[in-house]
Amino acid sequence: MARSKSSEKWLKEHFKDPFVQRAMKEGYRSRASYKLLEIQQKDHLIRPGMRVLDVGAAPGGWTQVAAPLIGRKGRLVAVDRLAMDPVADATVICGDVYDDAILAACQEALPGGADLIMSDMAPNMSGIASVDQARAIDLAELALDMAHRWLVPGGALLIKVFMGSGAEELRRALRRDFKKIVVRKPEASRARSTEQYWLALDFQGVAQERLDNGGASSL
């Protein structure tokens, strides 16, 4: 099937992108790695020995950055519906986080909860702005739901947020559960994109779905 002119234009722009070229040279799977590296440099959110859940992790750019920072004394779980190649010192789980079996697998890998949950999830774009924005906010809310399930008191949540309808409501929800929200726009984010990265710090809520002793609880 022949590519459309718009897809050809996107591919040309993509491969000319300096962060894409740098990722290829330095062995990262995605230009998104540099977004997390910049946030880490500014905020020092990932530390040795932490327990981290990377939601929507494929192809693994953020997982690659986080694994050596956490080290072998910590735990890093990367989950995505899409297949993902292994990353050293990380547990990769392939499946939908709405699936009970996948939730159980995450629980087994992180039995004591998570110190940090991070998500670089974005929807497959339809080209219809209102639809795409709603889907993007849904994914950010999914990451917040994961925080309610597994984040320990004092933990942090890092999410991608596309500014637009629903973003302010999401901000209010985060403020109910966290003491502070830091907003970042990394250099690797394309200037025309409305994406921001929100780092919510010092979780004040209670993880509702964590199975500390093998028994189930419900919302």
From Swiss-Prot:
A single MF term (Gene Ontology):
rRNA (uridine-2'-O-)-methyltransferase activity
Family matches, as InterPro entries: RNA_methyltr_RlmE, RNA_MeTrfase_FtsJ_dom, rRNA-MeTfrase_E, SAM-dependent_MTases_sf
- The EC designation for this entry is 2.1.1.166
Gene3D superfamilies according to UniProt: Vaccinia Virus protein VP39
**Does the entry feature the keyword Cytoplasm, yes or no?**
yes
What keywords sit in the KW lines? Cytoplasm, Methyltransferase, rRNA processing, S-adenosyl-L-methionine, Transferase
Catalytic reaction equation(s)? uridine(2552) in 23S rRNA + S-adenosyl-L-methionine = 2'-O-methyluridine(2552) in 23S rRNA + S-adenosyl-L-homocysteine + H(+)
Recorded superkingdom: Bacteria
Task: Enumerate the active-site residues.
Answer: 160 (proton acceptor)
The answer on whether this UniProt entry bears the keyword Transferase reads yes
Q: Which GO terms describe its cellular component?
A: cytoplasm
The residues that hold S-adenosyl-L-methionine are 60, 62, 80, 96, 120
Where is it localised? Cytoplasm
Q: What class of enzyme is it?
A: transferase
Q: What does this protein do?
A: Specifically methylates the uridine in position 2552 of 23S rRNA at the 2'-O position of the ribose in the fully assembled 50S ribosomal subunit.
* Protein family: Belongs to the class I-like SAM-binding methyltransferase superfamily. RNA methyltransferase RlmE family.
Q: Output this protein's name.
A: Ribosomal RNA large subunit methyltransferase E
Organism of this sequence: Acidithiobacillus ferrooxidans (strain ATCC 23270 / DSM 14882 / CIP 104768 / NCIMB 8455) (Ferrobacillus ferrooxidans (strain ATCC 23270))
Q: What is the primary gene name for this protein?
A: rlmE
